[in-house]
Amino acid sequence: MEYSSYNVNTPQWREITVGSHLPAELRKLAEIAHNLWWTWNDDVKKLYCDLDPGLWKEVEQNPVLFLERINYEKLVALAHDENFVYKMDAVYSAFKKYIDVEPDHQRPSIAYFSMEYGLDEVLKIYSGGLGMLAGDYLKEASDSNVDLCAIGLLYRYGYFDQSLSMDGQQTVNYKAQNFGQLPIEKVMQPDGKQLVIHVPYADSFVVHANVWKASVGRIPLYLLDTDNELNSEFDRPITHHLYGGDWENRLKQEILLGIGGMMTLKALGITKDVYHCNEGHAALINIQRLCDYINGGLNFGQAMELVRASSLYTVHTPVPAGHDYFDEGLFNKYMKGYPGKLGITWDNLMDLGRHNPGDKEERFCMSVFACKTCQEVNGVSKLHKSVSQQMFAPIWKGYFPEENHVGYVTNGVHLPTWCAAEWKKLFKDNFDENFFCDQSNQKIWEAVYGIPDEEIWNTRLKQKAKLLDYIKSKCSKDWLRSQVDPALSVSIFERFNPDALLIGFGRRFATYKRAHLLFTDIDRLARIVNNPKYPVQFIFAGKAHPNDGAGQGLIKQIVEISRRPEFLGKIIFLENYDMDLARHLISGVDIWMNTPMRLAEASGTSGEKALMNGVLNFSVLDGWWYEGYRKDAGWALTDKRTYQNEQYQNQLDAEAIYYLLEHDILPLYYEYGGKNYSEDWVKYIKNSIAQIAPHFTMKRQLDDYYDRFYNKLSEHFHILAADNFAKAKMMADWKANVRSRWDAIEIKSIEAGNGLNATIEAGKEYEVTVVVDEKGLDDAIGIESVIIRHEGGQDHIYEVIPLSSVSKNGNLYTFKATSGIFNAGSFKQAFRMYPKNALLPHRQDFCYVRWF
């Protein structure tokens, strides 16, 4: 007899998406939920919250998930609640009025590419400052009615969630996103199927990417994900993690963003005037754009003229190590088919990504490729412009760093997103009615001086109380999960003083951010935080990259210090720094502190967000604060570096922090006089809002991009593209002609009134004459005298004197100028020859230089 008590097969699961069944009267709620306009609209959030405050909190303020989980009977009742329907209709009316406005077609249209977007904590496609900036940019583009579309990647797991063990060790957790519960929608084709882009990754295979759309107000953000059953087990995870995996997966992601992104726009029939690479990750858009023009009948040189003329590259990192470099073998594995499509050699393609063309040992750098295929390049602050000019100087060796064309637009923040509701109401009640449309107008902001001090102070106290409640709630949950001793938790909150000055520090934990600086002299810090006359507390938050052991060590060190008896309740580290935590921190603390190594902070925007909430900044003069600092409106550590020795400099900066806390900041905060607040502290707040805030809004940033880059790019592109690309073809031919004759050009003679002597008299002018055989180039070159001076360990331009072409005899051109040096000292002089053409946007566009 056969006997068995076990017979079970494997379930054949299939995915089923059950949509929320809203009563017809409430369908407007779903429409609003699927547009991220709600992320910066307080009335919408209040509408959802009032329906079920507990559920709204439970779903982490995700309206799509909220409508899925809310009790259906409650919805039916609400559909017949006249008061609620009235509120909903008012919000929906405002939404439709906003959305239905046509974009401004008088301004150039933009295609924007970024690896990450920080739009809301609900949509986990961001990790840090780059994403925050990109998310804010889309929101302001929507508010400013700009014709812009964006491309990014949709990550299944996003960036990691952080938890801390009892001893402060960072633990990385990844939670899969359910795309059906996010404020995104599938991009559908006429046949009713989701649009899928087939991206070539090598000659032998393609990767299939699903296309999604997130509506950011009026702006469409198209997102690609590779979790498609048509893909292999090796390719489905390409978009699982933001900045996850090895260098091979990073390259796969960047191919998807750049090449796949352009293929997506083509499939959707979208063309724009300007293509903006937000960091080098997106640079491969220009590979695909070149291919498209070449497929249309142009050659490589002609296509490059058009691509360059309509491309902008924004660099965010201030150090060479922060850029993506790929070994030639790896790059060849995925890109070997492109030289044939472009009509160039493999070495030609590699050289587009090298500082030193022809150097076989040099890897392919996306940032270098971006510089060489984009007409315009910009840093993200005034100081970062100079840093970037130095960093990219090897690409344009014929020019000194300060001469190259790298510009800047200082980052700003989206005011409606980061300004707390109470502050927005205060501004709305007291400022000009056009305030939100004219945020860069300092005259409007100066109305803050007319707001009573008590109102300013009470608004600050409300935000601080909200933060303290948030901290207690968050820590209770986090510490329970990590099994922190309950007695320790009680002791921390017993010693926490709600009336103490509160200083916040929140950012990515990389060593150059110097989170450890405050702890340089532990004994002195203990005296400061335990001074009963001037109580002060510090709140830290931030994630370290999973591969950054030093950054994780800093977190562990701070957590360990915070558990010491003298620091209990005085220093707290909050885990899992995300947009929600950031929003509470930057509005609730009294001071926002930032202590990076000098020239290591490209811009930084967290301090700008704090600024919009009446929080004062205390920072190194780097990034945005180098431009923003005003006396009596915050505090600064000097931008000067005293010691080359990093340890000595850290000690000096720590001393400055302690001194300013003890002698300036704390006495000012507690100078109550006869009131329950410090009048001088409120004066600092008003100065900060009136004098600094108007210069760091995203509205100002967007306007700057148009004024400094988009307008001229669009104008130049349309000149080249007119009449079937006539001038693009002409410029390509002209450059080819210059290349072929350049080495043959002869310098026939150089004459100078001083006889080219090494010693000349200060202030005495003399004539310089240069005769050149241009070899048939027909006045296509320029000559200039370059005088340099050695200062600060480097050679810098003292003066550049252009020589004028005064006569021609066959191919012989005579150039003359009057020269002279009006300061005594040691100088160097040389002559520089370069190609010239009225259609060149700048010299680095065609970087041919001969020194003589």
What residue spans do the PLM features occupy?
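Catalytic cores of carbohydrate-active enzymes across secretory and cytosolic contexts
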Residues: 1-852
